[in-house]
């Protein structure tokens, strides 16, 4: 053999061998996880355990009143006289920039004050991107938000970060800012960094945790937002949304009057998406999808007599808002009006998401532990807060704090004292799960689990919405936890 060809062959073998050695996927945890049994993975198993599966627990008006009550309490002194171990950890609440406990009232602020707020919030985004915002991540203590990499897990250079910062255009924010009214025309990602192309994500490590942490959340279709600033290219706008401050692609919203927006965001007659993701179509044949909406999203009905015909917010070429008609399939997974709040409906919705992957930052339009239960209960009208550590203050009817030093028996007793299907519990760092029952005296929950376990020398990753016992996450019984009873 030609020595040159031999050398090339050896190089190829070495390169391929090195690749193959690192090409294994992470082991998927089995469908039936430790601590559970196969029968549990059906809705029938849990419905059979319910005393009154079709009893309406709360009316829609009572649920909306709970939302109003929570917002009112948060505007006052929300944590006054609360157990110190029940009060949320500020580091968890502010893990990402742009969050707030109470929606800022821009109407009560002067243009100069709005400008100061915008400069501060955009500054937080810049600091976050440059690793100056957060020192560490609760639950991932070995990982710090100090530097980021792209989709190939290659660290960003200074000039790349400079380009992103230039796009944020902080230098163009004037001394006074007048908010513009707009509405999202699709489910829109709320970004910390206004990136240009799909590979420009914010990975925090080259490992299993390949989440894009340059994302805050997904803002629902038809959500009113206040536009406060635009990026240098005009490709993004900086907004105040129901999910926080952040950057939304300009093409994903439309400008309109408050009255026009209200008709779409607060409709009197509407359908709620009760499927994981439901398309809408351009005509009655439902051949070509025109878009989609997600669990808990609402769309106005064009006519009460036709539950298939909905109005969707549409961005015209000039950026202004228009309302267009769209069709739902005959078997579309939706509810006309709020879904009745029954135990059967809770577990049915929960099982529709079974197996969905864990998306910590919602950058893939997925869900994490908090947003899974938020979207689930949104179908009934609940507007749960952005962070699970605030859930206990939403219902405010269970102020119990369970501590590790009480021991496993007391911890189990405290969990099992709550009503299944209607109770969310939250443990250290804001991790939450939906309590659904017990197996041999041990609590069983549904959880979008970002963790895994070792067995016989093999690592199994869960990282999906599924059933589990209290062994996941492994720190659950080692931290304080609280409850949110939605009844």
Question: Residues of each region from the PLM?
Answer:
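Bacterial N-terminal signal peptides
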Residues: 9-17
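Boundary regions of SH3-family modules and the immediately adjacent low-complexity/disordered segments
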Residues: 24-191, 197-202, 207-210, 240-275, ...
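Low-complexity, Gly/Ser/Thr/Pro-rich intrinsically disordered linker/tail segments
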Residues: 35, 41-45, 49, 62-69, ...
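Conserved beta-strand/loop element in small beta-rich adapter and peptidoglycan-binding domains
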Residues: 207-231, 286-305
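Second-shell loop/turn segments in exported
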Residues: 212, 332-337, 355-364
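...with weaker cross-activation on analogous glycine-rich loops/strands in unrelated enzymes
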Residues: 218, 385-456
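Glycine-rich catalytic cores of cysteine/serine-nucleophile enzymes that process amide/ester linkages
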Residues: 277-326, 356-367, 428-474
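Active-site nucleophilic cysteine motif
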Residues: 346, 360-391, 429
């Amino acid at each position: 053999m030609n020595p040159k060809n031999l050398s090339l062959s050896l190089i190829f073998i070495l390169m391929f061998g090195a690749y193959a050695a690192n090409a294994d996927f992470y082991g998927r945890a089995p469908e039936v996880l430790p601590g559970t049994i196969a029968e549990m993975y059906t809705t029938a198993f849990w419905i059979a355990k319910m005393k009154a599966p079709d009893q309406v627990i709360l009316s829609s008006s009572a649920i909306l009143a709970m939302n109003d009550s929570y917002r009112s309490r948060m505007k006052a002194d929300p944590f006054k006289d609360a157990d110190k171990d029940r009060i949320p950890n500020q580091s968890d609440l502010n893990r990402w920039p742009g969050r707030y406990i109470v929606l800022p009232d821009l109407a009560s602020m002067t243009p100069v004050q709005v400008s100061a707020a915008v400069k501060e919030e955009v500054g937080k985004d810049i600091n976050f991107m440059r690793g100056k915002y957060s020192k560490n991540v609760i639950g991932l203590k070995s990982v710090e938000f100090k530097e980021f990499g792209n989709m190939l897990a290659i660290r960003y250079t200074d000039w790349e970060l400079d380009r992103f910062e230039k796009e944020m255009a902080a230098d163009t924010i004037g001394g006074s800012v007048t908010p513009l009214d707009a509405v999202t025309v699709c489910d829109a990602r709320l970004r910390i960094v206004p990136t240009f192309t799909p590979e420009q994500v914010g990975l925090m490590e080259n490992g299993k945790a390949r989440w894009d942490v340059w994302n805050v959340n997904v803002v629902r279709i038809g959500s009113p937002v206040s536009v406060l600033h635009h990026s240098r290219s005009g490709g993004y706008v900086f907004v105040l949304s129901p999910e926080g401050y952040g950057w939304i692609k300009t093409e994903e919203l439309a400008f309109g009057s408050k009255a026009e927006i209200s008709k779409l965001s607060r409709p009197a007659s509407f359908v709620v998406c009760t499927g994981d993701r439901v398309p809408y179509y351009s005509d009655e044949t439902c051949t070509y999808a025109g878009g989609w909406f997600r669990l808990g999203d609402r769309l106005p009905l064009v006519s009460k007599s036709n539950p298939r015909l909905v109005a969707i917010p549409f961005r015209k070429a000039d950026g202004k808002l228009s309302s267009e008609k769209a069709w739902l399939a005959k078997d579309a997974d939706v509810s006309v009006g709020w879904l009745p709040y029954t135990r059967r409906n809770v577990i049915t919705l929960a099982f529709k998401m079974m197996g969905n992957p864990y998306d910590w930052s919602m950058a893939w339009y997925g869900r994490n532990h908090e947003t899974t239960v938020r979207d689930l209960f949104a179908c009934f009208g609940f507007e749960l807060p952005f962070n699970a550590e605030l859930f206990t203050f939403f219902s405010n009817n269970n102020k119990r704090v369970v501590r590790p030093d009480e021991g496993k028996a007391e911890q189990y007793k405290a969990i099992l004292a709550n009503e299944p299907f209607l109770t969310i519990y939250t443990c250290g760092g804001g991790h939450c799960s939906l309590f659904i029952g017990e197996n041999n005296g041990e609590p069983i929950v549904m959880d979008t689990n970002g963790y895994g376990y070792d067995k016989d020398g093999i690592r199994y990753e869960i990282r999906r919405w599924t059933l589990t016992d209290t062994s996941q996450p492994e720190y659950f019984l080692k931290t304080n936890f609280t409850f949110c009873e939605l009844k």
